[in-house]
Amino acid sequence: MKYCNVLDKEDVKNKTVEALRRAKETDREYGFNFCSADGKVIATYVEGGKKDSVGMDNVCPIGAKVIGALHIHTRPSLSRDAIPSPTDIKKSVVENMDFFCIGTNVNNQGIVRCFGKDDLVSDMVHILRKDRKDKLEKLGIKIEDIDRSIDRSTRLMVGRMTVYKDYLDRHSCQRIFVG
């Protein structure tokens, strides 16, 4: 999980803490992009959004390309853990990101969890499809739970994704920011 090291860079730590603080103060999502130029990873400025979306532009400095993104969830249904929503997964796939990070504030701690496209996204997309019963059974997940969640709203579906916590723990890295 080579992308985990990016969370330990001083400028990324500072921007992550800023995004966590601003999200907590305003109850709006905040985030930023990770860009790659000349073999270096840089973090863009922190952008603010709405209560349940950030709407970040896919922008980097001239000569750099977007390789990832980080944003902070504020909704109560996501506050138990930093778990990606189906929209987060879809966006990372469509925009061909190498990794993406989700954060949330819980008990005066900022939790940020990053996921790489190679070790999570393709598997998660398949898991969320009804026709992958064999893979679901291997993970000990009941197909009825998936059917129910697919037929309901995204918010309920995200709630059902907590079933995948063990799976997510094996396919992500996590950092705690005290604030």
Question: Can you say where each PLM-predicted feature lies in the sequence?
Answer:
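Active-site or metal-binding loop neighborhoods of secreted/extracellular toxin and effector enzymes
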Residues: 96-179
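Short HxH-centered metal-ligating active-site micro-motif
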Residues: 40-98, 105
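Glycine-rich short-loop/terminal segments
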Residues: 1-66, 141-179
